[in-house]
Regions:
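Cysteine-centered iron-sulfur cluster-binding motifs in ferredoxin-type domains/subunits
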Residues: 181-183
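FMN-binding flavodoxin-like domain, especially the glycine-rich phosphate-binding loop
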Residues: 1-2, 6-13, 20-32, 37, ...
Length: 183
């Protein structure tokens, strides 16, 4: 099962690639989150969660929905996070989420896609966006291969900067810049 949350299409694109390559069903979390639908989602043992990066972690509304929703059959979870430049130390928080859900954490992959957080950054022009998406293909392919083979994603780098951005900066950045009023 491939679950995805997408606001601008980057995560949806990656999730669709994963679902097609792995012959897995695809479920958008957007409508379920919007309607507060936390009814159980039947899955096989492999659960792939594709989300954008909000302030160097998965979006809080996605985290909360995942915590409230049961996934009968799921035993392992892989996280794939799309971002404009980096996901910080998000894997640590995804591991904690897996522990809370009694799932084996299979790691977090970072897929750099066109920047779309236009409140603070310039979105790339069309040609640059196409170049970024083309450059992301090998990372998407590696993620597909890992899930297909049941392998964990390689551990990301573990720098003080990443821990700082996903840790103390996250709540400040979230309070000042992240809005989810559409949900």
């Amino acid at each position: 099962m491939i679950l995805y949350f997408s606001g601008t299409g980057n995560s949806k694109y990656v999730a669709q690639r994963m679902a097609e390559a792995l012959n897995q069903s695809l479920l958008s979390m957007n409508d379920r989150i919007r309607s507060h639908d936390t009814s159980p989602v039947e899955t096989d043992e492999r659960l792939v969660i594709v989300t954008p990066t909000y302030a160097w972690r998965i979006p809080r509304l996605v985290r909360d929905w995942l915590l409230e929703t049961e996934f009968p059959g799921a035993a392992q979870a892989w996280f794939i996070m799309t971002c404009g430049s980096e996901i910080g130390h998000a894997g640590r928080y995804n591991r904690s989420l897996c522990q809370a859900k009694d799932l084996t954490d299979m790691g977090t992959a970072q897929i750099i896609m066109p920047e779309n957080y236009i409140a603070m950054f310039d979105a790339p022009q069309a040609e640059e966006a196409r170049r970024i998406v083309a450059k992301a293909q090998p990372d998407i392919d590696r993620s597909i291969a890992a899930v297909r083979e049941g392998r964990p994603f390689p551990p990301p780098h573990d720098r003080l900067y990443d821990r700082f951005m996903s840790g103390p900066v996250n709540p400040i950045f979230y309070a000042c810049f992240v809005k989810s009023s559409a949900f």
